[in-house]
Amino acid sequence: VGADGTALQKPNSAQKEKMIVYKNSIQPSMVSETPAAYEGNLWKRLSQSKFRSSFTLKANDRHYVIEKGMDTVRSHATDFIRDRLAPAEPKNDGKQTPMRGHPVFIGQHATGTCCRSCLEKWHHIPKGRELTETEQKYVVDVIMEWIKRQMQTL
């Protein structure tokens, strides 16, 4: 029974797939949604952080994206996330993402996907376990959405 006295229904299998266990409770997972769906939530929260909103793509980063193309940058993001963020205990966690050198690194800091602590804080994906393929795709999608938005601004 819910707080309002109405009967609660158990989630169906599709709904269960959209949920993760988080700190001994079930929380809706954002991993199955598209980043654009969080216009009023994720992007707003990130924009309100002085640190996160300070990151922008510089001219050389923009040139790199134009030269390589979004598909190649997405491929790099996929590799970086798989190798540096997805393990349950990433090497040098909290320090594994450089502050410059690749548009994806800048995007990771801007979106709170740079380390497992930030991923937990900003995206409610718990640390201490390996990221699922769906979670990895979500992280890449968030970063690529940020890069796309940056490429549309001057």
Pin down the residues of each PLM region:
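Immediate flanking context of iron-sulfur cluster ligation sites
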Residues: 92-111
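Core of compact, soluble alpha-helical bundle domains
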Residues: 33-81
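Extreme N-terminal basic, low-complexity initiation segments
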Residues: 2-12
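Short Fe-S-cluster ligation motifs
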Residues: 138-154
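Polybasic, lysine-rich low-complexity intrinsically disordered segments
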Residues: 10, 16-18, 24
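Membrane-interfacial helix-loop segments of redox and metal-homeostasis proteins
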Residues: 58-68, 83-85, 96-97, 101, ...
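Iron-sulfur (Fe-S) cluster-binding segments and ferredoxin-like electron-carrier domains
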Residues: 117-138
